[in-house]
């Protein structure tokens, strides 16, 4: 749910990525252009209810991992998705990102954060344009919550 636009909801499940603009009465499928329609982590841009971020995962029988060994965050636009990969590992990055392991903060530009089951936290302080490892060698990250402390 977008904090400033409670009518706008996003949903990702085992059969697609969806958006509702009427508090969940109707849903539109918005995963066209993603490499997979399966994945868990998703967060909404703090100021633009039309933009969300997700990390599609390649479904395997017993695990879910970043696609093709590359870690890619996708940012939605009006009718398309854009890859955001600068600073993310692009080779041998067979990482899993769990359902609640992605969030955004309220800064401008927005900070976007996600954690992996391998114990890494990735952070972007520019709406997802560039990424860095904010923490590594942690236990599995099951949930990420961003907070701004002033």
Specify the residue positions occupied by each region the protein language model found.
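Extracellular glycan-interacting surfaces
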Residues: 1-150
